[in-house]
């Protein structure tokens, strides 16, 4: 129904944000990765959207990029993977890393997503491995290794902060602003300094 929604970014909650357009506040469910890249509240944003209609629920899901929206829709084609699980998968890192994990059969990375077990990860790999195209494979080997290493570092740092009691949303936002060239320990220390301000 909606191709995209453009308006003022009003507020953020656990799994959705509110965008105001023509004095109407739209509740848009989104991923942790999109939330981490949003500008300050009060600024104008545009999200590419998909509406899901069920007997007991109508919801609009939005993402900053068409690539993330396409991946969300692709994940929904898998039996047993609903909108909530798809958002969880898209929240573990960026789309390129998720695609790379699927293509390489990396169950460990996929099961980092809350609510995604080994069997579901195997089903995702089996059904999507030959369907996805990944830009990351067009880069040279060194770039691929660096990108995946950085993303794994981010995932581990986020997991560490969540263990310490911070929300995944908070952790993602802070970690994404840290210097990824640092060691995992340094990234966590830098994030904690910021969170304790």
Curated annotation (Swiss-Prot):
The RuvA-RuvB-RuvC complex processes Holliday junction (HJ) DNA during genetic recombination and DNA repair, while the RuvA-RuvB complex plays an important role in the rescue of blocked DNA replication forks via replication fork reversal (RFR). RuvA specifically binds to HJ cruciform DNA, conferring on it an open structure. The RuvB hexamer acts as an ATP-dependent pump, pulling dsDNA into and through the RuvAB complex. HJ branch migration allows RuvC to scan DNA until it finds its consensus sequence, where it cleaves and resolves the cruciform DNA. Has three domains with a flexible linker between the domains II and III and assumes an 'L' shape. Domain III is highly mobile and contacts RuvB. This is Holliday junction branch migration complex subunit RuvA. Keywords: Cytoplasm, DNA damage, DNA recombination, DNA repair, DNA-binding. The gene is ruvA. One of its GO terms (biological process) is DNA repair. Residues 65-144 are annotated as: Domain II. It is found in: Cytoplasm. Residues 149-197 are annotated as: Domain III.
């Amino acid at each position: 129904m909606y191709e995209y929604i453009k308006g003022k970014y009003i507020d953020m909650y656990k799994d959705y944000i509110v965008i105001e357009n023509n004095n109407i506040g739209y509740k848009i469910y989104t991923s942790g990765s999109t939330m981490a890249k949003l500008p300050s509240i009060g600024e104008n944003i545009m999200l590419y959207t998909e509406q899901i209609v069920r007997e007991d629920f109508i919801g609009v899901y939005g993402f900053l990029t068409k690539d993330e929206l396409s991946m969300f829709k692709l994940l929904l084609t898998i039996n047993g993977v609903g909108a909530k699980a798809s958002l969880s998968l898209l929240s573990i890192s960026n789309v390129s890393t998720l695609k790379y994990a699927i293509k390489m059969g990396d169950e460990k990375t996929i099961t980092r997503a809350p609510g995604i077990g080994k069997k579901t990860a195997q089903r995702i790999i089996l059904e999507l491995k030959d369907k996805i195209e990944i830009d990351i494979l067009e880069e040279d080997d060194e770039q691929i290794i660096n990108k995946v290493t950085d993303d794994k570092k981010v995932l581990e740092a986020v997991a560490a902060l969540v263990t310490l009691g911070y929300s995944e949303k908070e952790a993602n936002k802070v970690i994404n602003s840290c210097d990824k060239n640092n060691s995992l320990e340094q990234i966590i220390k830098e994030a904690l300094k910021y969170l304790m301000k």
